[in-house]
Amino acid sequence: MAPKVGINGFGRIGRIVFRNAINHGEVDVVAVNDPFIETHYAAYMLKYDSTHGQFKGTIETYEEGLIVNGKKIRFFAERDPAAIPWGTTGADYIVESTGVFTTQEKAAAHLKGGAKKVVISAPSADAPMFVMGVNNTSYTKDINVLSNASCTTNCLAPLAKVINDKFGIVEGLMTTVHSYTATQKVVDAPSSKDWRGGRTAAQNIIPSSTGAAKAVGKVIPTLNGKLTGMAMRVPTSNVSVVDLTCRLEKATSYDEIKKALKDASENELKGILGYTEDDIVSSDLNGDDHSSIFDAKAGIALNSNFVKLVSWYDNEWGYSRRVVDLIAYISKVDAQ
């Protein structure tokens, strides 16, 4: 039986997790909580999306929530996670997608309302992080609060895993050229902690920090301390790209690297890692399910031990799909 899921926070990731769950079929969304939007507005936001298009299905409202494709979904408006009555809906697995409750202690408040597990759709300072295809098999059923890491970590980790397993990574630097997100500004506005981040998103290339590369060391312990990185926020609405420049232990050719990644994309990382030799640009990957799509034509090698690898990701859709996949996976482990 499909695990019953609740979503806390109906913003970008919350809504796209919802859409993916409807398409996925392996999880059953039964409830949503968001104190900042009313039910009829939630229906509107779910139906129309500037990036991913109209919802392919039916959406109605009733006195207690939404009716999506004929199925009733409860809608709550609680500010305190501990006050959300997940238990009354049968929701065992909660997607914590507000971006606010990202520590184990804060996210665990959902358990007080009857939930059994919480998956944080963001990096966490202290919750164990899992990346599908990389370290998800290390999950054990005693873990109640976990993180799906970040969209960028989900892109970088499968790429780094294949390269490290086959050739060994001595050290590396990552840059993500990242589409703007909801935390950025439409016009120049105050941003006391990050002055550059307060500048207009649609007019600027904005250097920024990211913990995504360091986080790879948490999901692949042998790479701990070997990777770090930064971000360039750019004026595109969706789809981002990772540039991993690394020094290899084992001398190899770029063709051998391509072969290793192509093999992985067709076998152990199928559905997680994509591979393309087409002359694609970012918009071609809008709505792509993969965590990471290696661009064979975009990378270069300086010599047999020093390479630049390029991999794309839909930072909204692909990441949200992995949230759903992670819940489907851990529910099977929990049932054993």
UniProtKB/Swiss-Prot annotation:
Subcellular localization, as worded in the UniProt entry: Cytoplasm
SUPFAM superfamilies named in the record: Glyceraldehyde-3-phosphate dehydrogenase-like, C-terminal domain, NAD(P)-binding Rossmann-fold domains
Enzyme class of the recorded protein, top EC level: oxidoreductase
Top-level division of the source organism's lineage: Eukaryota
Single Gene Ontology MF annotation: NADP binding
Active site: 151 (nucleophile)
Keyword Cytoplasm recorded: yes
The reaction(s) this protein catalyses: D-glyceraldehyde 3-phosphate + phosphate + NAD(+) = (2R)-3-phospho-glyceroyl phosphate + NADH + H(+)
GO terms for biological process, alphabetical: glucose metabolic process; glycolytic process
Primary location group: cytoplasm
Protein name: Glyceraldehyde-3-phosphate dehydrogenase
UniProt source species: Aspergillus niger
Upper classification of the organism: Eukaryota, Fungi, Dikarya, Ascomycota, Pezizomycotina
